[in-house]
Amino acid sequence: MRLMRYLFTTVLTLLFISCSKGCSYNESQSSHVEQTTASNQVEDKISPDDYELSTDGLTLIKWKNPNTKVLDMNRDTYLSKIRFIGDWAFWDCNGLTSINIPNSVTSIGEWAFMQCSSLTSINIPNSVTRIKHYAFSNCSSLTSIDIPNSVTSIEQGAFSDCNSLTNTYIPSSVTSIGKEAFASCSHLTDINIPSSVTSIESQAFMQCLRLKSINIPSSVTSIGKEVFAFCSSLTSINIPNSVRSIGRAAFYDCGSLTNVTMPSSVTSIDKFAFARCINLASVVFRGNNPPKIPSLDSYVFNETPSNLKLIIPKGAKNRYIKAGYPEDKIIEQ
């Protein structure tokens, strides 16, 4: 999956390079003196040659100085007034370690900070309402991120492959977590999903290898395909009564998962949902009516322990057998 994403972004990169760039914003030169931050980092001087703006001065098209390490955009006359950070604007700025975004900015573009491998700190102001696709993907030194409460959705791949990210704050303004939003954040240990979230899209937390537990709020109605696949440290999961469907391979290869409780609200479980959960000991079904499952060739519990127990309510055994659940694993309780 990650290889496909990298191939995809590589193709887009080549297309981007081949396209003609927008016009520079030619105004009188701006300048500022070196400043020392609270963390004793020296902010780099800003020259008009360091960046390219759109003709109206509202969009940062490209940051052009590869040697910049600490950047406070508020200290430049024109950067402090921009509204948009454009697609690819800081792409592959490997030396950039810290950036302060002005509170005039409302949108951070697609791939804007992708592969800024030295970026450890970023201030996202409350003016920002959109963090677009793959905006911070592959920022491998970023350890934490505070998403402002002005943001309503975390879009596709926004923080994917941020390998050093250990925690993140998701505000109650967020209603949806997009596809691959935190995929392959291999050091992410826990995350709090607020009750405002109604949608968690496919692969959102796929390959978060150190994620141990997650609480899904009762506002969520479905768990998309491969959302928690390959989360090998995940030991517990709370599925609320609001959830109606569990997508394909949603918990595939979650090798540390031992017990799952399935609320009566769940009406369908797609193929391979819990396949290769090699330590899964029991699944407790609360409903008298079994969730619909696919045929045995794509069985929900493929490659799970032979002594897996499917615990169901008393009197419901025949219904579960007719629905395709294996009789030898069913225990009425």
Where are these regions (language model features)?
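Short linear proline/tyrosine/threonine-rich motifs used for host-factor recruitment
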Residues: L60-K62
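Sec-dependent bacterial lipoprotein signal peptides
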Residues: M1-S18
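Bacterial Sec-dependent N-terminal signal peptides
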Residues: F16-D49
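Structural signature of tandem-repeat unit edges
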Residues: P48-G57, P66-F84, N94-S107, S117-R130, ...
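Consensus positions within tandem repeat domains that build extended binding/scaffold surfaces
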Residues: G86-A89, G109-A112, K132-S137, E155-S160, ...
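Short, aromatic/basic amphipathic alpha-helical patches
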Residues: D297-F301, A316-K329
